Amino acid sequence: MVLGSSQSSAKELTTQSSIFRFLVLLLCFTSATGGQINGKLLNGNGVFVSRDELQNKNVLGVITGFDLLVVATHSRFQVFENNEERRTVGHVSLDMHPRTKFLELKLFSKSEIFYCDESSCGLCTYSGVTSSCSTFMLNGDEPKIQEILSSSAVKIENLGQIMLAISFKNEEDPDNPRTMILRYNAQDTGTVIPTAYHADSSFIHNNHALTGFEREGFVYFVMTASQIFEPEVFLHDQSNNKVTVTKVIRFCATDQTADLASKISILVGCDQEFRNISSRGETAVYDHANDLINIVMFNHTSMNHLMCRFKMANIEKRFKTIWSTCQETSFSGSTAKTTRCKYPQIFDQMKVKKGCLTYSRLDDESSPTLCVRYGRGDALDNCQLHTAKSNSYRYGWLEDYNVLQGELMMRIPYPFFGIAESLITDGKSYFAAVSGEFDMSDVLRFSASESADIRPHWRTNISVVGKFSITKTKENQLLYTTVEGLQSLDISCKGLYPNCQTLRQGGWEDPLECSWCADDNAQRTITSSEVSSCKNNLKHECPPSMRWIHKYNNNSGFTAVVDGFRALKNPKLNACGTNCVVTVVDSSSIQCDTNPDEVIGDSCKQVFLSGMIGDKNYSFPFDYQQADRGTQTDVKNSQVDDKKGSSPGWKIAIAIISVMTIILIVAIIVYYMRNRFPRIKTHVRPPIGQRIENEYDMGHMAGRQAQLAINGDNYVKVFRSMRPDLKVDFKNLRVDKLDPIGQGHYGVVYKAMYSPSKSLEEKVVCKYLKEGKISEFYEEARTMSEFDHPNILKLIGVALDDSSHLPIIITEYMAKGDLKSFIENVENTIKMRDLFEFAFDIAKGMNYMHSKKFIHRDLACRNCLLDEHLRVKIADFGLCRKVDIETELYVQMHERDLPVRWFPPEISEQGFGITSDIWSFGVVIWELFTRGSTPYSNMASWILILPWLKESETNRLRKPPYCPEKLYTDVMLACWKANPAERPQFSDLVTIIPNVVKYMEGYDRSQLQAGYERVSSRFLSLSRHDPAFPIYQNEMPNTPLLANCQNDTNDSKTLAELPSDSPSTSTAIPQSTPYQLLSECSETSV
């Protein structure tokens, strides 16, 4: 009984213990979901996640400060310790109104979080799980805020007040966003009413608040806006010119006026080369440690992003100078000041006169008022305006148009990224969250070269891009948003560059000074401090990697395919002590032979590849697997087999008999097929040298109806399988089949009218399938559906002819036809500027296409079309293919005729790639500036062209007569570099081409507006040094591409600044104001 009782008690105890453990686990789970558990914020994949909302796409931002880390989701702020433990210290529950982003998110203290979303702003405090939030009233009756677009908040610590800058859509005028600056008492409950506010003038639009901070008794905001250029209004009493400016705004922290009259704004920039006022600020960060402001802005004149750095000491000095200068002029002297500044009415003279570029927002009128002393009485300090004896003549709210020049840190060519949303400094490097043109969001790490050019180092995708997508922790980790939550990354050589390939993509130049250790069994990324412990340290080169290695079946040598082989000089192979002499070397493989008396046995399992990298010899071991052996015959060493007594005669006889048997079988099959299917016609296209045709040329039509009898049902089946959004009802089309207008790779083209609804009708083009190439025909349509760009032909849809069941591709109608025919036509008056516009349009379209990882493979003037406004659109995608994302190459699977006169010589060995289109683009520009001549017209075929191009890099198409030397050398010859890696990308070309135009405008603008004659074929065969060769008379080849900033003049224009009589209406390059920045190129103090 005792024993039984004991056992019973043990069971009860075990049951109770299990229940207790279950309750403990349940309590832990409940605490975890409530955000109270002191657990880590790190999952098994090294991803920081939001515990309070399991769907991690709800993570909208992350910030750090006061030794805390705050993760913001749609409905909660989760607060953690900013250390390795990441323990939860509290959370704030927000109201449940829908929000998609935070426009401001800032820690004011260890217990205060300020936020703004699209509709409201508030201040929250927390203590563990207890929290409260206030709502900041943004307006009374006026203005009526429809949506907040940007915001920045600053807490004035010693006063317990908050200043808030917001830009917003006004319900009454939503197309012109406005700005307000408001001041509040810091309050974390209820509704907080502003104690003062300032609304910007109505002529200032598209405002955006970038950042804000407090410094030495003043509050600063960095903002950007579009506004009327007030100096011109002042001179001429009217102006329609608007400028886009970036400005720093200062308020006195102790300003007690109801409308914040201490406000002063100064314009800032650092565009020494292009000194026009036309810069849109995108993101800014104040570096407290170094007392600097870093601003990323987009310059509309240079078409580049710029990173500018400003010393706060210089900014503050400018503010003091502006205020003191305005206080020097009394009210009685204002008329004389106006006369002195306004006459003569010449801007260049006015800008050098003291105080003539600072205006007061005395009221909300668009007429600018020169600043004079505030309040009409004695001169006041900027922070004492509330003591003014009179409420009249309150000349505050100053704005100075003398642009303060900062230090140019970096030029970032467009479109390296679209818009910079946020910026983090990391020593000599930077992290930025950026958005692209095609809904692509990335985090970048980059630094500046000595010449202020960007050096990209590292890049990764993020799920949501915004002001708070990235942050840096105390442990020198980068946190960024992903679809999983928050990804953590060590900011170190090993964290950023885990393998040599990532180093090669930009890590070599990282200021972290990373390199690759290629030691046996210890290959890794190392820092400069670890170099001494590495025997095989590599910098700027990666060790080769063996993809496979095959041994000859007579054991006399190897063939090896090696990645990264070009880095190795004087390569050698050694197999188990046996030297294998390298006999054949190409771009990615080597072959080697052993001595006749040496044989590599089957027991050998390792091969060493050695050679020079830089000035040091390296040796890399590779395992030789049994499965790789005996797969190749060494023809060179057949004599070795003779010495060993083998007789190859019978092998040769068998080979001959086998080949003859195969030929006989193929002949029988061909004979059978030709008699079995007599109606199937094989269409052979003419050689490429004879087929210089455009997409709208009429082609061969015979045999079509017979082909339909075989494939009609297949067409219907394939059409039904197409995506619904691509299908067009044939009943909505009226096709003019009596007048075909041309032929593409897979179809015949007709004009048509498309009526998707009763009230809408538009001209379109219908391309009908020819000769049964159904898969390639629909592939062209699928490819076109991937594109949406103003310089690429738009796909309307795909239809099926009701009567013939022929598939149809429907595209937009291009009124001016193909580019080749247009430039060939001598009746068309074409100016040199038009040719530049055509080239620029094509470059933009190709830049977009390459960003989508497609290559065109048939880029030529005949495949570019012109709309009624002479905008070029790239067409004919019959050869367009998706490239491999890693190699950026496309492997040709089927032989067919190709436009080889537009192709680079390397395609015969390496296949098609991104750089193939770059070469073709150079030929397209040559076509443009010869007005449609045929490339290599004196050579009959590719057999002659290919060896001529390979023989020397000087063997290239000659510079067309009348073509500017700078265009030929900087663009055409650059596109025709023998090494594909040295060719510019289209992302470079969209900047280079406008710069060539600016260069030309510097010495002969009239030439751009002159008619450009068609080049006679006789001149194309002449040497450039031949006396009969026509020349561009005003060529100045020794003039630098961009003038020095000290010699810059008001004559600098952009490509888009076309005279009214120009036939082109392209607005691809934005207009810029003719007004220059008013200070010198270096950073100025006043």
Swiss-Prot record:
EC number: 2.7.10.1
PTM: May be autophosphorylated on Tyr-890 following dimerization.
Stretches with biased composition (Polar residues): 1061-1086
Annotated region described as Disordered, given as residue ranges: 1056-1086
CDD domains: PTKc
Binding site for ATP: I741, G742, Q743, G744, H745, Y746, G747, V748, V749, K767
Catalytic activity: L-tyrosyl-[protein] + ATP = O-phospho-L-tyrosyl-[protein] + ADP + H(+)
Top-rank EC class of the record's enzyme: transferase
Extracellular compartment residues: 35-651
Marked site positions, Required for shc-1 interaction: K767
Molecular functions (GO terms): ATP binding; mitogen-activated protein kinase kinase kinase binding; protein tyrosine kinase activity; transmembrane receptor protein tyrosine kinase activity
Residues linked to a glycan: N276, N299, N461, N554, N617
Sorted UniProt keywords: ATP-binding, Cell membrane, Glycoprotein, Kinase, Membrane, Nucleotide-binding, Phosphoprotein, Receptor, Signal, Transferase, Transmembrane, Transmembrane helix, Tyrosine-protein kinase
Effect of a null allele: Viable. Reduced axon regeneration 24 hours following injury of D-type motor neurons.
Residues with Phosphotyrosine modification: Y890
Stated role: Receptor tyrosine kinase which may phosphorylate mlk-1, a component of the mlk-1, mek-1 and kgb-1 pathway. Involved in axon regeneration after injury by promoting the generation of productive and stable growth cones.
Protein known as: Tyrosine-protein kinase receptor svh-2
Organism field: Caenorhabditis elegans
Record gene name: svh-2
